[in-house]
Amino acid sequence: MAGKMSIVLFVLLVVFLTQNQVSRANIMRDEQQQQQRNNQLYGVSEGRLHPQDCQPKCTYRCSKTSYKKPCMFFCQKCCAKCLCVPAGTYGNKQSCPCYNNWKTKRGGPKCP
């Protein structure tokens, strides 16, 4: 009788420890996914800008266009991802590859 009780307790202990390990692995995976989402939110660290620097850079970048609202919207979206905005009001995208290579579904440039 005592032998059976020991085996049952041992099996319960093994099941408990296994569930504990699985739970820890799931928590670590969730934390890693959250960290990846946070990195996507603040850029790929390609550029040197801080997220708060995007507004003034995009304001200058879009200063000469007649489509200011869409230009600012996409410029800020691109800056948040790439953490850089090319110099000047047009062109110079080679200085910011992430900004240059982000395309729309149709294959056109996403960033102004």
From Swiss-Prot:
Pfam families: GASA
Cellular compartments annotated: Secreted
Induction: By gibberellins. Inhibited by abscisic acid (ABA).
Name of the featured protein: Protein GAST1
Keywords attached to this entry: Disulfide bond, Secreted, Signal
The keyword Signal is assigned to this record: yes
Superkingdom as given in the UniProt entry: Eukaryota
Similarity section: Belongs to the GASA family.
Entry PTM: Six disulfide bonds may be present.
Tissue specificity of this protein: All shoot organs.
Signal peptide: 1-25
GO cellular component assignments: extracellular region
